[in-house]
């Protein structure tokens, strides 16, 4: 029954929208621009329609990451740091971005830039697709610093830096003889308060588990076992052993509130932005509220535990993975990595990031495993969970750097290695590989790395197919300004062939 339910949902994909060739920015449409010569009712070209769709996607992603940092600042009662991008970015890049008009105009203007990006894509505003593409890069930079960097830095300051440890993961971490509480989403504020509660000796009957990026964050910082990535969140509830699923923001499937109705599970929403039918809404805005809500959740979960059906069992085994790396605790220093690259002992660094998209059937994990003989691998997000499940996160060739916002750690690793090599980032053999994107956030993260001068691979069409004129334009524009490339390669074999033939530093430059 559940399988059919999911299959039916997957059948609802629009093949035209998938390529970005549908404009629904006004009510003269929606208009389809299947061919290059097609125009929308207002005269918008295919290039304009596709570029506007990409920008709206990027704006969605940037708003999520910048919102994450903003919520954390508000929670901590802190102000935005002054001149943040200037402080964090390499100076040559800061000057380049400034020269080409990619920086927010003033303090706090980054949210205005996201809003202006939406404005520029409304019907009858910007008709220059080249300028629309420029906006994508601008929002990528905002996402990188006012989202990824700031959220990571604040959380590290308050909740501590991760530590290298062996973590447990998979549905097997759910304990049949305990009250199971899952924390799910991206902003681990309440999850941190729950950890403190759960570690009190009167709460030894509680088993706290993580899902999605909140799960990655608490796994890396505290060793809280991780039950599932985005793709498996429904399976967590379907075990029938979850008393409460506590969600914050982003990547929380609306389906879970329906699914929870079939079990005894209580869904608890904890952020003003995220409400769900049939859920208990307990928003938190400060530390005191977080502590009180954490306390209430535990007693609510215990009550729900009385309704759990008897004799439930978990069939899946636990997996283990080495987690908890960050930019300063990799086994090799930036200088050692730079030297290995210079001496050709290492062909480069590949960061595998992003989601785990069920529509992608190709076996990227197998390819990464093969390539790890020659390349050092970093990973974050849901795809990191997939690599862990395949047994690759042994702390030798693959290094797990946390959640989606922790892509800031990858940017830092790249910056530090390039600095140690006395080169600019675009001179180094670095690659971002996002084989299975789902969320808009994967696209804005990609735009950020492209603006840093790192090549970005997507393994799934993101409103763009490689034969389109706009894809070629994006390629050229990036090459000219940032010496980087965003490219699509859906076939692992083809990807490997290109990599082996020419290597990272030359093929994609
Ligand atoms: S949770 S953005 S499905 S990685 Fe960060 Fe996973 Fe992608 Fe959400």
Segments from the language model and where they lie:
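Anaerobic metallocofactor- and corrinoid-dependent redox/one-carbon enzyme cores
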Residues: 2-509
